[in-house]
Amino acid sequence: MGKLELINRVYDKLCDEESKRVYEAKLELIINNDEMKFLDWFISEYKDIRCPELEAYEKKNPNAEYILFGAGKEGQKAYKILKSCGKKVIGWCDNNKNLYDGKNQIFQGEPGILPNDLGLHYSDKTVIISVKNSLPIYQQLVLMGFPREHIIISMNGSLLGSHGNQYFDLFSADKTEKEIFVDAGCWDGVTTKTFVEWCGGDKHYDKIYAFEPDESCWEKCEETFSKAGISNVCFVKKGTWNEKDTLYFKTSGRGSSSIGNKETANLRIQVTSIDEVLNGGKATFIKLDVEGSEMETLIGAQETIRNYKPKLAISVYHKPEDMWMVAEYVMKLNPDYKLYLRHYTTCSYETILYAI
């Protein structure tokens, strides 16, 4: 089967119109790499967008007014995200003096503010640094006396908007039998915690298998499990793969660690398969977010999936082809699955394939 035929076949298998709109938008992003157009689509598609990076800050500063430092592409994206979330933007700032000439004094309808004026007249406002290389601007702001507590640095210089309840949106907890949850790529344990909340507490699940190979994340996971009082967790400190092995691993500690090669990796890790760990046992729900190893992990879970048809929530954004290759493989494992696709953020990350 050719690639185009496979892409169209997966499109036809998607079970609702939202899934098809997401599929089309992601395909266009893969082909054209137009992040701004994708952002515009996301904002038009979803009306419940929130900005998680600002939520903790706004608990302490409920009337925050924002100034964007950086009028390039990231600043333009940040402006659209803030407005879609209902935030108050009062101006923008940039070190490029040419942007302040004549008609360019206004950016996206907001006034331009000279960098030197921030510390003098705007120290009660909040500056969001909206450039990739944020450290020099942060240092510039601190040196001019701008309060550190009113400076927000977005991850990778890109403010992120999101919506929905990722991994759980399309599923209802089965109250007739207890859930058995597999969290492959549990990072900080928060998804496991969300699962417990979703299913209604420890009376409604039998067991949780949590896989995480990144040693720098183990303490976070265990702390999350302990604070939330999560019981019956089998914490597997290994990566998921199609078999038991030892592989090169590139660790970040930020939820984006991944299998690498000898040249790029900074350590070696043990990996195993879901079928090996469950050893013929049941799973009712499998979540996979394993930074590009989703297909190998599915191959290593094929017996569990064939035998028990668990609910599946699979990340399909780490590799462009995963969106159709993973869907095709899931259909081969169990043709009775109904497939849905959802996207959760204003960037290309966090596209989830659901199989029910």
Locate the predicted segments by residue.
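Phosphate/nucleotide-binding beta-alpha loop and adjacent structural elements of enzyme active sites
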Residues: 1-65, 69, 73-90, 95-356
